[in-house]
Design a protein with these regions (language model features):
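Glycine-rich phosphate/pyrophosphate-binding loops
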Residues: 42-71
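C-terminal accessory domains and tails appended to enzymatic cores
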Residues: 66, 83-235
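Glycine- and Gly-Pro-enriched alpha-helical subdomains that act as flexible
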Residues: 72-79
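Acidic, metal/ion-coordinating pockets
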Residues: 2-11, 43-44
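Glycine/threonine-rich flexible loop motifs
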Residues: 27-36
Length: 235
């Protein structure tokens, strides 16, 4: 991001807005947003003092209809212009999630907050047994994950449990996220968050600041009670 801001396009004059995306896949709720390179790029622009918008397209199936994508892009262009022209006070970046649904331009655009959720069913990675003379097919694995994301399926079945401990140092892993955790957290949430809005077919706009906001109510000096002990103790 900084290379683009400071080392390219200088002949065009100062950059007044950075658009990161569109990412083909939603960046809603905490678990997706915190690992999003799309939002990360917009945050990097924001900490450089440039207004920025992270744009993501939320798909629901693998039917990538060109007309639906075109409709989402047309809406995105209008929405970006609207946000740019009336930039909110205190906002450093916006996270925009546009659902890939028919007639999205006729559906609601909602202000939202980020749904606080978590991975609750265990690891999003699985150990895979790969013979020494073979390697995993990353392209095929990515395609399978995308199919699971579209269908809302988990990476592994309930009750399957984790892998047994293997007595060797080298392990290979594949990403097998438990999308059910995300979809259930959205279904159980109250209206008003980004995941809920997209699930309703509405476009979500979340105003953000480029920081990890502290929790209010903690102030002053921290005093440790009890006797001083060594940093390390033998058990």
């Amino acid at each position: 991001m900084q290379i683009g801001l400071y080392h390219y396009f200088t002949a065009r004059g100062p950059i007044d807005l950075v658009i990161s995306g569109p990412n083909y896949g939603r960046n809603t709720t905490a678990v997706f947003s915190l690992s999003s390179g799309t939002i990360g790029g917009a945050m990097e622009a924001a900490v450089c003092g440039v207004k920025s918008i992270a744009l993501s397209y939320a798909f629901f199936d693998r039917n990538h209809d060109a007309a639906i994508i075109a409709g989402a892009s047309e809406l995105s262009a209008r929405l970006i212009q609207h946000l740019h022209d009336g930039w909110g006070e205190g906002v450093q970046l916006y996270s925009v999630n546009v659902p890939l649904v028919e007639s999205v331009g006729e559906k609601k655009i909602l202000w939202t907050d980020v749904l606080q959720n978590k991975w609750s069913s265990g690891s999003c990675f699985q150990v895979v047994d790969v013979p020494d003379d073979e390697s995993s097919d990353a392209v095929a694995d990515e395609a399978q994950i995308r199919r699971q994301e579209a269908s809302g399926k988990m990476g592994k079945e309930d009750g399957e449990g984790g892998q047994k401990h293997m007595r060797y140092t080298h392990k290979e892993f594949k990403w097998a996220p438990l999308f059910k955790d995300v979809y259930e957290s959205v279904a159980q949430s109250k209206p008003g968050n980004d995941g809920w809005a997209v699930a309703q077919g509405s476009t979500s706009v979340t105003p953000l600041r480029a920081n990890f906001m502290h929790v209010a109510g903690f102030q002053g000096e921290i005093k440790l009670g009890g006797e001083k002990k060594g940093a390390l103790q033998e058990s």
